[in-house]
């Protein structure tokens, strides 16, 4: 008879085994989401790309589909997820291309997919009908490694789908099929082998069985978001084991948290995987690009090429990027920046003769910028559950009005905000007029001096449905009146009031002039683009502000319509209402890495101090010390207005799609804002305010 201790130990072991099984299934579940997203790319992107950028085409330029065998249902993801997954496909394919291009023809290459899931990569590259993979056909073989339960399903699909069986030779020689091992498949160019990668001994045994220690064989290990769920010491043992084999390459694509676990996107991403019982583990130890380099060097790979996914996007040639921009309407650049900076692509090798060629080389290094702290201002919480983004707000008289935006659906309501010390109350304005603007976002809503009125300019419905209509809202009568439309659509532009009551409009996604002036008296729009080469292209989502005391304005950051380049300049200009031919002239241009912001908002605190808040950058993430900064335009000095640790760690914070408003109390409020964090859920701002510190 078993004693009580033995029974308790047995029960404990059963529970541990059950927990492990559940965790394994949760990790396998992440594969289902990933492969469905790649199917979305296969359906939407690949048919629209030319042969130069399509991974899957036959000799008649017909699209070959491989993901459909594992995801038969037609899937459509959001534009940001689609672009992100196209980039993931490009990441692995481009690294494999670089290896095969530099490997001598007489060398055999084996690609080992660690945690392969339902990835059809072997079938893409071995299919002799696929002219885009001709260089792989006679040179490469594949080994798929994953959990036994998952491989059983994958192998059963391979056996029952003639197209897949034929690619790897199953239909030609039944001897390769071993029905006694349903998680085990062997053909001349394709092996499927079960392995729990948490078991380093099992993995080493498998490497031996597959004869991968042969120095004449080039080994390429691919880990696309598969080691990230393992404890660092276990994933490290996998990497180290592969480094002990001559002629070995390791390609890893996984999550990154370069500004720590409390950066808003990072916090949401970590929480998402934890909720799904597949917590990210390695990323907490190897959270930066530098730490990944050190990791692979320490584990035996002397030569490492590593960068984040936006660096990969930048490395794609211009023709490819232009073609991708045409695939589907896209207006999620802030979210794309955030996604890209949270994924790392690393190619490591122990083969000293291998050269990372220019087309594949990540060579940008970013140094940390330390700023002195601005002791005059601090950021506090201020309850404002507006739950909207990409609307606009302005002060008219003693009232604050917020118009439009999305929550997540586009709206055309006007909210009246009553600002108190620690909270903001809001109510819907009941509009008297029967004719009202359509729901929209990415517009401007700007005070004009004439009788407490607000000017609504442009905006958009869907990303491909820009608007050209303009309206004036009268706060006394609560009526909308439509004014002359623009000759072009315009959204993601900026606008500010000028001392004479006119309104300056800058840039946006438009085919119109780079700068317009709305003359309130004449009720016309006039092209006032400065004669400066900087304004040859329209600036998108730039910061714009004018100071009536110094009679100068500032334009900060802003992107261009290539969706890659973002300005790192602050342009100081003056406005001369008497100069009919050239009312806007550039005085000075300042340049700084922290000016490189897309979607930031700026506001003068004093004529000698400009507040710069939020936005995203192609160069990296902002943190709690540089998300909010101040600029003295005269001395050209920058200071930090740090976000307190308590707000950074505990507050719902996302400095994208928000607005700034100054109040008569001398405070500046961050109103609205938020972003969808890729497939990890949305984050919205609750409310923040900037106050002067009493001396």
Swiss-Prot record:
Organism: Saccharomyces cerevisiae (strain ATCC 204508 / S288c)
Keywords tagged on the record: Cytoplasm, Methyltransferase, Mitochondrion, S-adenosyl-L-methionine, Transferase, tRNA processing
Disulfide bonds: none
Assigned GO CC terms: cytoplasm; mitochondrion
Keyword Cytoplasm: yes
Name of the protein in its database record: tRNA wybutosine-synthesizing protein 4
Function: S-adenosyl-L-methionine-dependent methyltransferase that acts as a component of the wybutosine biosynthesis pathway. Wybutosine is a hyper modified guanosine with a tricyclic base found at the 3'-position adjacent to the anticodon of eukaryotic phenylalanine tRNA. Catalyzes the final 2 independent reactions, methylation of the alpha-carboxy group of wybutosine-72 to form wybutosine-58, and methoxycarbonylation of alpha-amino group of wybutosine-58 through the fixation of CO(2) to complete wybutosine.
One function term, GO molecular function aspect: tRNA methyltransferase activity
Gene name for this UniProt entry: PPM2
Chain sites annotated for binding S-adenosyl-L-methionine: 38, 88, 115, 146-147, 196-197, 224
Pfam families in UniProt: Kelch_4, LCM
């Amino acid at each position: 008879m078993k004693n009580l201790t033995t029974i308790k130990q047995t029960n404990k072991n059963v529970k541990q085994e059950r927990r492990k099984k559940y965790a394994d299934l949760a990790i396998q579940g992440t594969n289902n989401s990933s492969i469905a997203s790649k199917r979305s790319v296969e359906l939407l992107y690949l048919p629209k790309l030319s042969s130069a950028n399509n991974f899957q085409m036959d000799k008649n330029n017909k699209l070959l589909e491989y993901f459909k065998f594992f995801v038969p249902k037609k899937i459509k993801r959001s534009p940001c997820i689609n672009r992100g997954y196209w980039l993931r496909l490009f990441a692995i394919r481009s690294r494999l291309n670089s290896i095969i291009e530099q490997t001598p023809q007489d060398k055999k290459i084996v690609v080992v997919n660690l945690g392969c899931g339902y990835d059809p990569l072997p079938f893409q590259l071995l299919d002799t009908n696929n002219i885009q993979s001709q260089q792989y056909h006679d040179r490469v073989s594949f080994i798929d490694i994953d959990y036994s339960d998952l491989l059983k399903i994958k192998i059963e699909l391979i056996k029952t789908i003639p197209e897949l069986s034929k690619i790897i030779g199953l239909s030609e020689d039944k001897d390769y099929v071993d029905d006694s091992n349903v998680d085990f498949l062997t053909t001349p160019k394709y092996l499927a082998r079960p392995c729990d990668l948490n078991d380093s001994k099992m993995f080493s045994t498998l490497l031996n069985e597959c004869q991968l220690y042969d120095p004449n064989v080039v080994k390429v290990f691919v880990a696309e978001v598969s080691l990230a769920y393992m404890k660092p010491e276990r994933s490290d043992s996998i990497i180290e084991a592969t480094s002990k084999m001559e002629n070995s390459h390791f390609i890893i694509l996984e999550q990154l948290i370069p500004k720590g676990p409390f950066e808003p996107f990072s916090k949401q991403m970590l929480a998402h995987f934890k909720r799904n019982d597949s917590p990210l583990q390695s990323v907490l130890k190897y959270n930066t690009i530098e730490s990944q380099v050190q990791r692979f060097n320490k584990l035996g790979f002397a030569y490492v090429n590593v960068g984040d996914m936006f660096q990969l996007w930048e490395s794609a040639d211009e023709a490819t990027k232009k073609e991708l921009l045409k695939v589907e309407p896209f207006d999620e650049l802030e979210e794309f920046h955030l996604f890209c900076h949270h994924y790392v692509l690393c190619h490591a090798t122990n083969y000293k003769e291998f050269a990372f060629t220019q087309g594949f080389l990540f060579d940008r290094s970013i140094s940390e910028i330390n700023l002195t702290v601005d002791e005059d201002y601090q950021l506090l919480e201020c309850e404002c559950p507006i739950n909207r983004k990409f609307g606009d707000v302005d002060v008219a008289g003693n009232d604050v009005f917020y118009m439009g935006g999305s929550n997540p659906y586009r709206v055309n309501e006007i909210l009246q905000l009553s600002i108190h010390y620690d909270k903001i109350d809001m109510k819907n304005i009941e509009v008297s007029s029967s004719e009202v603007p359509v729901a929209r976002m990415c517009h401007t809503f700007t005070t004009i001096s004439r009788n407490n009125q607000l000017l609504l300019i442009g905006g958009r419905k869907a990303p491909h449905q820009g608007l050209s209509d303009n309206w004036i809202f009268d706060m006394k009568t609560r009526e909308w009146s439509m004014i002359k439309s623009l000759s072009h659509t315009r959204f993601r532009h900026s606008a500010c009031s000028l001392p004479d009551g006119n309104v300056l409009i800058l840039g946006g996604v438009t085919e119109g002039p780079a700068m317009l002036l709305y003359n309130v008296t004449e009720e016309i729009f006039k092209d006032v683009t400065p004669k400066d080469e900087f304004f040859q292209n329209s600036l998108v989502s730039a910061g714009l502000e004018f100071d009536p005391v110094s009679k100068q304005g500032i334009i900060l950051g802003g992107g261009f319509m290539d969706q890659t380049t973002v300005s790192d300049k602050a342009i100081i200009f003056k406005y001369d209402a008497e100069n009919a031919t050239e009312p806007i002239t550039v005085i000075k241009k300042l340049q700084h890495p922290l000016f490189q912001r897309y979607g930031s908002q700026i506001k003068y605190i004093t004529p000698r101090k400009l507040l710069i808040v939020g936005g995203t950058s192609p160069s990296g993430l902002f943190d709690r010390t540089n998300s909010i900064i101040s600029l003295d335009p005269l001395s050209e000095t920058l200071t930090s207005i740090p976000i307190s640790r308590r707000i950074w760690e505990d507050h719902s914070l996302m400095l994208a799609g928000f607005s700034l408003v100054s109040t008569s109390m001398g405070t500046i409020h961050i109103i609205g804002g938020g972003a969808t964090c890729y497939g990890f859920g949305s984050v919205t701002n609750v409310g923040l305010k900037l106050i002067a510190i009493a001396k």
